[in-house]
Structures are given as structure tokens and as C-alpha cells.
UniProtKB/Swiss-Prot annotation:
The keyword Hydrolase does not apply. This is Large ribosomal subunit protein uL30m. Residues 1-34 form a transit peptide. GO terms for biological process: translation. Its main location: mitochondrion. Component of the mitochondrial ribosome large subunit (39S) which comprises a 16S rRNA and about 50 distinct proteins. CDD domains: Ribosomal_L30. It is found in: Mitochondrion. Keywords: Mitochondrion, Ribonucleoprotein, Ribosomal protein, Transit peptide. InterPro entries: Ribo_uL30_ferredoxin-like_sf (IPR036919), Ribosomal_uL30_bac-type (IPR005996), Ribosomal_uL30_ferredoxin-like (IPR016082). GO terms for molecular function: structural constituent of ribosome. Belongs to the universal ribosomal protein uL30 family. It holds the Pfam family Ribosomal_L30.
Length: 161
């Protein structure tokens, strides 16, 4: 910058306009190489296909309502927006499952960090649990939510003779 100012001071007034025009072109951001560019992956890659449903065992007419999301890779040396999404989804601790709804807003966030996580459908073989069963449930590694039924003792009838 000092060299440009030295040129402005040493040149006659007619040359001043050409130097200032050159400075204006340097001030713009057109000459900066941006590191992150738009992804060149076509949209058809992200669309669901019948082969995917056969391969992964999904039903497009009856999709599952809940996801089990588990972070399986570290967020170190990842961009800040991926770290923010991991924090929003509650996946700071690795290999700890979190349950999320299968809705477009959540799915768009999951798509950004899909290389860091594992997504499984939540299977409910015994149906939706009730409030009383909430303490008697556990989650299998296969994605099944199992309710442990506690048997109540049978009351014995006393015979009066």
C-alpha cells in the first residue's frame, strides 16, 4: 500500500486517476479465491430410489416415525457448522443414541452430518409405550425399543371351612 501511495505522490495529476482506478479494483472481493465452493453433486443422488428401499429394508408408503441417531466419528478438524449441528442434535458424546423425529427439518440437518453419524429406524414391536412403562424400557443395539413386563403376583384365594 505504501508503494501505491508513493506512486500517487510522485506522478503528475493526470496519472492520479489511473492509479486510483487500480486501487478500487484491488478493494473488491473478486480477486479473492474462496475456499468453500458450492457442491457439484447432482440432486438425483440425494433422491430415494426403489433399489435403496430394497437394500436397506425401508417402506416408502409407511416410513418410520422416529430415528435413532448415533455419532460414530469425531468432530475434531471438522468445520464449525458441522460441530453446531452435532451440538443441536445432542450428539456431543459419541456412541450414545439419541431419538429424533423423521421430519424434513431434522432430516436436512442429518444430511449435513451424515458422514459422522449412523441413522437407524426406531422399531416398536410392542407398540408405543405408556407412561407406566417408561421406566421399564430399554433400547437394543438393533434399534428395537423393548418394554420389560413385570409380573404381578397372583393373589391366592383363601378357603373358609
Amino acid at each position: 500500500m505504501a508503494g501505491i501511495l508513493r506512486l500517487v505522490v510522485q506522478r503528475p495529476p493526470g496519472g492520479l486517476q489511473t492509479v486510483t482506478k487500480g486501487v478500487e479494483s484491488l478493494i473488491g472481493t473478486d480477486w479473492i479465491r474462496h475456499k468453500f465452493t458450492k457442491s457439484r453433486i447432482p440432486d438425483k443422488v440425494f433422491q430415494a430410489s426403489p433399489e435403496d428401499h430394497e437394500k436397506y429394508g425401508g417402506d416408502p408408503q409407511n416410513p418410520h416415525k422416529l430415528h435413532i441417531v448415533t455419532r460414530i466419528k469425531s468432530t475434531r478438524r471438522r468445520p464449525y457448522w458441522e460441530k453446531d449441528i452435532i451440538k443441536m442434535l445432542g450428539l456431543e458424546k459419541s456412541h450414545t443414541p439419541q431419538v429424533h423425529k423423521n421430519i424434513p427439518s431434522v432430516n436436512s440437518k442429518l444430511k449435513v452430518v451424515k458422514h459422522l453419524i449412523r441413522i437407524q429406524p426406531l422399531k416398536l414391536p410392542q407398540g408405543l409405550p405408556t407412561e407406566e412403562n417408561m421406566s421399564n424400557m430399554y433400547l437394543k443395539s438393533t434399534g428395537e425399543l423393548v418394554v420389560q413386563w413385570h409380573l404381578k403376583p397372583v393373589e391366592q384365594k383363601t378357603h373358609e371351612s
